[in-house]
UniProtKB/Swiss-Prot annotation:
Belongs to the 'phage' integrase family. XerC subfamily. The gene is xerC. One of its GO terms (biological process) is cell division. It comes from Roseiflexus sp. (strain RS-1). Residues 1-85 form the Core-binding (CB) domain. This is Tyrosine recombinase XerC. Residues 106-291 form the Tyr recombinase domain.
Amino acid sequence: MNDQVEAFLRHLADERNLAANTIAAYRTDLDQFCDFVSARNRREWRDVSHDDILSFMLYLRERRYASSTVARRVAAVKSFFAFLTGSGAVPHDPTERIDSPKVDRDLPRALTPHQVDELLELPLRSPTPERIRDKAMLELLYATGMRVSELVALNMTDIDLVHSTVRCTGKNGRVRVLPINGSAATALEEYCDNSRSQLARGSDAPIDALFLNHRGKRLTRQGFWLILKQYAEEMGLGELTPHMLRHSFAVHMLNAGADLRAVQELLGHTSISTTQIYTHINHASSAQPVRSEPRATEVNGVINEQALVPEEK
């Protein structure tokens, strides 16, 4: 049974060009499902029945998995059996009459503009090479709304400080070129001109990565998460996740009057409905101040002047 799971995962990588993190999530979901049906004495995938699928969903609910997790597990199983059916490995699809569970969709959590300002000022209170790097990363995240996975994948050649743009590669290899504001450009210039070379001394060979760790290697998502956790503790915040900066960018842009379609392109969303969820968040503390924030006004000005560079095909 594991051989067919591996074949499916290779299909996701080679044919559908899914990201490594997405494939890892599929593996986790299918490993749990495989353990479940094996415990029910199913030795071949053709032995799995409609009742097995329903029992798996009940199993997840009884263990109080979040509705989003149940929905993801079921979606992974449905995709897997569609693959098996299409390849002729099973005669019928036991998930065919299974409805995807409804997901209780929580609104994204965003920081207020005041909290963003405090976060962006924290690194320079003790300007070490690492914290100057942190300043550049945080400014860039808030200025562009890019994902952390996109941030840590940036190379030196992706930054164009002359034209104030950054080129990032998103999900499914989609490339977009984003404008950056003056605050982010200044922070990046300071980092690239001074701090990066100090961090690079820890590396045995030249490296293209834009953001380096203290050993001179490319900073990882996990490394960034630990950095952000440190700043959250310094601010006294109960929780601060990397994605909250992306949420904050979107909410503050829309509250300041930015066009929904422009924000969709900046975020790299394929569907406008994904971006629309941010219109339901309107912090009383962020509706007005964001208009007078130099950082936010500058970004919003880029949008209003239609300086957004279209996503490359």
